[in-house]
Amino acid sequence: MPKTLVVTNDYPPRQGGIQSFVHALACARPPDSVVVYAPAWEGAAAFDARQPFPVIRHRNSLMLPVPGVLHRAQEIVKAHGCDTVLFGAAAPLGLLAPGLRRAGIKRCVAVTHGHEAGWAMLPGARQLLRRIGDEVDVVTYLGDYFRTRLTRALSPAAAARMIRLAPGVDVTEFRPGSGGATVRERLGLAGRPLVVCVSRLVPRKGQDMLIRAWPQVRAAIGGAALLLVGGGTYRAALENLAERLRVKSSVTFAGSVPWRDLPAYYDAGDVFAMPCRTRRRGLDVEGLGIVYLEASASGLPVVAGDSGGAPDAVLRGQTGYVVDGRSAAAVAGPLIQLLSDPERAAAMGRKGRVWVEAEWRWDLVAERLAAVLSGAPPP
């Protein structure tokens, strides 16, 4: 069977959305058709031993398109009979494409995420993306926003070959009734109107705007509580903000939780909100925002920020709302609407579940990935 070599700096056990996406793409292929080449990372040996396909580790934690990395990748191609390469992130490892073709690779696919939209604004990085686009067969994109931004950096020929490839959602894991009541009981939140946010605690994600909106929400919805799930260095600043605004008693910081426990934390909420915002003059933007889709799969209405590709994960007015993540008032409005009208919130949550089941399942992503790797028209 022809094999695909996945060349990536972003791979578990290192944590992050890109790492999870690339791992899921590898797992979406038949196990005997995949080989992964990734950097060393703490805990990698134990993680790799659980995988159904070979994972070959670089000697350190970063791979660059230098002769040593190319030579090792060429050895893997020849040893495993690979004819296709999937670059887990287009830049910079996509520059290895010509050298891998010399080793026998016939098709090169480069995956993009959210950060490339910022790179496309910078002269040096834009030239790098253009070169990679010309050297691979396909550059993938998450959604329409990123396609527009990337098109400006690519040559017309490379832009014409772009294909959408976005993450999927495991609808068997993320579903209503997956343990939310237990989470509520454990955190002392049973019976309270609850807004949940699942994300790293960083400025772009907008947890600070949820806290700034919270006095207005609390004034309208008695007993409302906010549950922030995720870790990060921003936590201390958020805790201080909640104390200054005198809402600390109604804001719960759950910290980081294992992936296997996330469905229960989504299920605990009545509404999901992550009012992300674009920062650094467009260099720091949200990717697709898979958390909105996981929340929809869990039966929750969502409130998303208008950054990057986040709106692509919401059917406006049907599965949730898209708001200006820079405005506390804009964030508070839909939260109050949804918490004050449980029937409407539940209906939007049901619509979200149906939409994710129909459009965002991982088996659909697997079919699309298979077509992209083979050169067939994607479904």
Each model region followed by its residue ranges:
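Conserved donor-binding/catalytic core segment of Leloir-type glycosyltransferases
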Residues: 7, 140, 181, 189-205, ...
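Short His-centered aromatic/hydrophobic patch
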Residues: 87-93
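Donor nucleotide-sugar binding/catalytic pocket of nucleotide-sugar-dependent glycosyltransferases
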Residues: 134-178, 189, 252-254
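A short, well-ordered alpha-helix in the C-terminal region of glycosyltransferases
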Residues: 223, 250, 330, 337, ...
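Nucleotide-activated donor-binding/catalytic signature segment of Leloir-type glycosyltransferases, i.e.
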Residues: 239-261, 271
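Acidic donor-binding loop of glycosyltransferase active sites
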Residues: 250, 256, 267-285, 300
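Short hydrophobic beta-strand element within catalytic cores of glycosyltransferases
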Residues: 273, 292, 297, 301-304, ...
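Conserved acidic donor-binding segment of nucleotide-sugar-dependent glycosyltransferases
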Residues: 315-317, 321-328, 337-343
